[in-house]
Amino acid sequence: MKLLEGQIRIPSGCAIAAVISKDGNMMTGEKIVESMKPMHERSNGLGGGFAGYGIYPEYRDFYALHIFYDDNNCRTVCEQFLKDRFEIVKAENMPFRKVPEITDAPLMWRYFVATLSSLLSATQVDEKEYVARTVMKINTELKGTYVFSSGKNMGVFKAVGFPEDVGVFYRLDEYEGYSWTAHGRYPTNTPGWWGGAHPFSLL
């Protein structure tokens, strides 16, 4: 008897992995990237991504914003928006290496920011709520701009592509963290786009 869709339970469809040091030992992203290779067939190339924790020890007290831009005009608008709401400690292009499997990359920038006590007092919300609201405002109101990571001492790295290629693209072998997670998408009814790759992160 041939079973039709919906008549058999498929417990999972994507590729996922995690590497965690319970002792807090640092490890490069190379191991988590390698762990995704045997699961290549569990993705279809429409989205792959990683999250690393403990990767920014020198900026551990600041929120690390990873942002995609459609163009430099979008970046100019967003940077003014950020300057009005945060102290920007550092702003830089996100490092990457060109790989033939990853194409059509948006502009990728990274900012380390601190909240301003005067604005926290004025809005009467705590630091985390303030950052979350600001990120959501950017992602819903600033066209051509998408904040895809905004936590402290952690970062998300994602793209349209297979996860093992995404890891090479973002040079994860050059980062060290105590915890890594990875995801390979297998979307069946949605298009692949850079912001829609997993994982998703807010704080």
Describe every region a protein language model picked out.
Residues 1-203:
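N-terminal segments that mediate ammonia production and transfer
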